[in-house]
Amino acid sequence: MTLTSAHPKSKLMKRFAALGPYLREGQCQNDHFFFDCLAVCINVKLAPEKREFWGGWIELEPSAGRFTYVYQLGLFNKEGNWNAEKISDPEVQDKLESTLRSFHLRLEEMLASIDMKLEPAADFNDQPVKLSA
């Protein structure tokens, strides 16, 4: 599948995967891309399959000359599902914001290298973290 004449989906998937362990290929559908990050383990004493994490996820969609995004911060539960939740621990919040900003910057740079912009989706008004100026 080609998203634009210059950017086939297969090449974009390779570029996105090179950004780090964030791309979830199984959750990428057609022109929708899904990234997540399990940033802070809640209880490391549990067996790996029972652990829960604080983290976040980003969803991208292409449009003319750009990708739009929405993101959420929250809990990745032991069932393997994301739930948007308010983070009450300031240390965890700082870690999540730092991780999200770092990924956002790398993603923005990668997209700029192929002459694409990264912008918030038009209906994404409730941004919990300011990602760019």
Swiss-Prot record:
One GO cellular component, as annotated: cytoplasm
Positions the record marks as coiled coil are none
Tell me the domain of life. Answer: Bacteria
Protein transport recorded as keyword: no
UniProt-annotated stretches for the region Essential for activity: 99-122
**Known function:** Binds to the sigma-S subunit of RNA polymerase, activating expression of sigma-S-regulated genes. Stimulates RNA polymerase holoenzyme formation and may bind to several other sigma factors, such as sigma-70 and sigma-32.
Stated family: Belongs to the Crl family.
Stated name of the protein: Sigma factor-binding protein Crl
- Provide the organism lineage as a comma list: Bacteria, Pseudomonadati, Pseudomonadota, Gammaproteobacteria, Enterobacterales
